[in-house]
Each structure stands twice: as structure tokens, then as C-alpha cells.
Amino acid sequence: MAQDITLKLPSGISAPTQEDITAAKEYVLERSRAEIALASAVDGILKEYAERMIRVCYKYNIDPQSFSFGANDSMRQEVYAILDDLLEELLSLIEEDSVPQNRKNKHYGAIISWLATLGTHNKDLKWTTQYYISRFSKDVEALVAAMKYAGYDVNKAVNRSKSILHTLYISPEVLSAMKSGKMFNAEGIISGGTKYDPFTHKPSVGLSKYGATNLVTMARSTLAKAWMESEFMEAEDEGMGGYYVFRGSSYPCSHICDLECGWFHPMSMGMVCPLHSSCQCWVLYVKSDKGEITNYRNLNPYML
């Protein structure tokens, strides 16, 4: 992050101190560390649940080409029970770890209630998590079929799964099954990992073909939003008049981040950050001496 900033303030705004600037930058860095920790935890859980599903599937003597979760009712019920457990564990982890200082945060209840409303397709967090878990399950189904086709025993399949959940459809085992010319029942082998929007029924746009990647990204994004909302609530309590957004990285982002940088955002506008799933922009709150200020756009919206 840049060490110095130049900011032309409109009249009626108290200038922030260097301590304010340093704290604002450090807050986003601390948030990034929390994101990485949560992503690692989610990834570990997904590997654990993939193993549970693989071990269940290997108990049933189903040949690779005929294999799918629906090939045996008992197996399907066992797998779905595991997926239900996964949903509960992920939601609990994401909600608990996404709030800065956890239950010590005085806004904990409000942030948890707000988090529950977040999601894709105008749905909430639970629906979104279920949706991505469904996509993840299709990957595990394809993985089992491919490992069986490769002749792997259950332990080798489990060990292999831990390194390819985010690259499954370019792994040698899955590629071998897809290119074999044989008919498979596992959906991921048939489609090559392509998944479809549940409403348009067209190939999904803007999502990874890997369910594990979607779940990790969603967890990180949810935490980032919670941290920025928590900071915003604290600023409201302190009577701040608004804030400025500054770039936290030099990555080109002219169509999103740059458009929000360098101009005054009144508190009534709400919190705009994070602006995308990997946004590192930081927010500098300022006090208003004369009520609400008209939005002011600085001539140079870039990080200095």
C-alpha cells in the first residue's frame, strides 16, 4: 500500500490525522489476514468432507461408468447426509469467523443478521452456500468415477483428491475418463465440469467450474463485507460524516475501484467496499463540521 496520500478536502470536512490513515490501511491488511485464515479453514473442511464422501462411495461396488450418487439409494442417502453436515458446518464457520472480534464486537448480532441476507442470484447466504455445495458435490462425483476408472483404491483416491479439488477437470485421471470415448453417468465427466445456472439453465457465467473454489471465494468475500460493514457501523457510532476510498493495490481496476476512489461518500450512501471479491481498497473516514457534504470528486482518483 502507498505510504503517502494527497487529498483535497471540501469545505466542512475535518482533515484526518496520519494516525487515522495508518489505522485505515492496517485495518484492511488485518482483514486480508483474516480472509486467508478463513479460506484455509474452509479448504480444510472441504477436503475432509470430500474424503468422507469418497469413502462412502467406495463401499458400494459400482463400476466407474455406471457410477453416480443416484446409482444406489443407500449411497445417495449417506452422501446427502454428509452434504447436510457440510452446510451446517460451513455456515457456522463463516458466520462466526466473519465478524471482527467475533462475539466481543458490540455489533455482532446486527452483523450476523445482515450477513444472512447476502448471497448470489438475489438469494441469501444459506441458499448460496447450498448452491455452491451442490456444485462441489458434482465435482466429488466426477472425481470418484475418474478414480475408479483409473483403478485407484479408496486410500489412493482420497490422497489424490486433496491436491486436485481446485483443478479437477485438468487432472490426468479426469481427463483420461473424459477422453476415453466411453459413456459415464457422472455429470462432471460428461460435461467436463461445465455447470448450469439454476434459473437460466445456461452455462454459469462469472463462477469457477470448481465448487471448492466457489465456496472458498464466497467465504472470503463474506468476511470482507462483514469487516467493512463493522467498520462502517463503528464510524456511524463515532459521528463520522463520510469517507473516502483509496486503492490498496496497483492492480489495474479502472472499471470498478478507480471509479469510487478520491471522492467524498456521505454516510447516507452506505458502505461500497469491498467492490469485488479480491478488493484491497481501504476506507478513510472523516468528520463533517457543517452537516452532510455534497459529493466531491478529486481530479486524481488514484492511489498516490
Model-derived regions, located:
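N-terminal leader/targeting and assembly helices and adjacent pre-domain segments
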Residues: 1-205, 287-304
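Acidic, glycine-rich two-metal-ion catalytic cores of nucleic acid-processing enzymes
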Residues: 178, 189-294, 299
